[in-house]
Curated annotation (Swiss-Prot):
Residues 35-58 are annotated as: Disordered. The keyword Secreted does not apply. It comes from the Eukaryota. GO terms for cellular component: chloroplast thylakoid lumen. This is Polyphenol oxidase, chloroplastic. Its EC number is 1.10.3.1. Keywords: Chloroplast, Copper, Disulfide bond, Metal-binding, Oxidoreductase, Plastid, Thioether bond, Thylakoid, Transit peptide. One of its GO terms (molecular function) is catechol oxidase activity. It is an enzyme of class 1 (oxidoreductase). Its cofactor is Cu(2+). There is a cross-link at C197-H214 (2'-(S-cysteinyl)-histidine (Cys-His)). The keyword Oxidoreductase applies. Cu cation B binds at H354, H358, H388.
Amino acid sequence: MATLSSPTIITTTSILLNNPFLPKTPQLSAHHHRGVRSVNGKVSCQTKNNNGNDENNQFQLIQNPNTNTPYLLDRRNILLGLGGMYAALGSEGANYYNTLAAPILPDVEKCTLSDALWDGSVGDHCCPPPFDLNITKDFEFKNYHNHVKKVRRPAHKAYEDQEWLNDYKRAIAIMKSLPMSDPRSHMQQARVHCAYCDGSYPVLGHNDTRLEVHASWLFPSFHRWYLYFYERILGKLINKPDFALPYWNWDHRDGMRIPEIFKEMDSPLFDPNRNTNHLDKMMNLSFVSDEEGSDVNEDDQYEENILLMRKAMVYPSVSDDPNKAELFLGSPYRAGDKMEGDVSGAGILERMPHNSVHVWTRSNTIKGNQDMGAFWSAGRDPLFYCHHSNVDRMWSLWTDVLHGGNFPKTPEYDDYRNAYFYFYDENANPVRVYVRDSFDTERLGYKYEDQELPWMSITQQQQQQQRQQQRQPLLGGRLKTRTFSLVKKVLTELKVMLPLPLKYSVIKTKVDRPKKSRTKEDKLEHEEVLVINFKLGKSKDFIKFDVYINDGTDYKPEDKTKINLEYAGSFTSLTHGGGGGGGDMSHMAEEDMGKNTVLKLALNQLLEDLDATDDDSIQVTIVPKSGTDSIVITGIDIE
């Protein structure tokens, strides 16, 4: 690893299982809550095995004999005898993790109230109706088989099938009319997202750690399952089991607007808590606020949108690096990790354009970033599910179309595969679903209608032309035209000392590369990754900063994000609610309020585009855009 010299470098990727997993006394205590049982020493759930037989699934506490650290294990994940298990405790790598599998498990018996808004003016809680774990069944494909494969189609083509559109409106209307006691009702479905995304559930065995499915490798799978059951509920309500959700096709020019079917004010698909300035406007997939870039014409905006999509989808897919799945899907998140400090960060799929679309859609007049701009309220807008249908489509495209190589499509750790969530199905029955069963949309019974992918066909010549049009570096106080080689030479001479606050100033610094002039084989096997470590404090605003490589532009925070050839990516984060019970954050340590976070960006293809593969170093530019007052950059490395 090449490291930028810094007095303080904070490493944030804590994937080793060396955190205190449980109190030193190996005893769990679940207090009597909402009529469910109390347990000590083990957590027992009655489930069904693959043959439909009852199975007493017990989580047991054991200790690593090398470290005396206790771990919570699911017996079904241990395929070794007792002697083999203890021998494996001293091993390293994936076998170590898989033997001591520590997946994230929600403690749904302890759902807590939360303040929805930061100032507490609107109180709400995120707890769906409680259920008895003793009667909860595990998901089995045979019990949710579809006789006809569902086809999700672009929302902007909805008027071509009036029968389907009428069914969609009727299903949403019925869902909204269901009583709050029904877990399938519109508000209760929205609360599912709030509960898993705003810290209402503690992690099983870790009462001081709140579960959060964003900013980790859980993000894609959770939302796929969420839409899966939401879609089945809608079909059940109108007695059409083959009903399929639409997808908001924001990666295609025809879909880069809020779909018309969601703008009819008398429709159940309408939500008043949207940005009224954007109802008929082409989307900006790198959006921050209406104040920046309002004068950009549609053709230029479209070109930037598809270049952003290419950088988000194609650039991370050009090598066979075994860690590629985590780079795209999100960083590891294991039991014992605290989202306030141990979880590294969101994957490419979540950061852009997912987060920007949320912010583009949220209300511009109502406080609290409602509805789409905050985790606690996003599920209240029917457009949310259409948006996430396209996010899910991006995952499918990355897996089935862009994959093409030998790297794993998903992380291979049992910590990831054996994590689970609870949902209500179309019959209002609770069901437990595992991450490992979410990978194949064909088995889940749905697919996406094919649509042109304009971001797949951008040519090198088009990118070079865009670079020439956009390059106007400000050097020596005067605007001059420079050749790319001269600009690169000047830029890479500067190096800054960290840590540095990002509050209002742009950070430009030289970063040494660990290896230059890499062979084709080396680049195929290993992705060069830019790693930006930073402290992230609380913010009431959408958080965003942009990153550029070898760019001579004199950027200012108020400038519109320029999606040019040098653009490497952005860090983004939506607004959270209070969590933790009435906004009580006492379960968090003081030092955790500024959490260690990391942004990882793929460099292989970008360095090729910039003719920088033979350089000893690169220049990194970090531009604050929104909510960065509490961000401190602590380290910039290449690995």
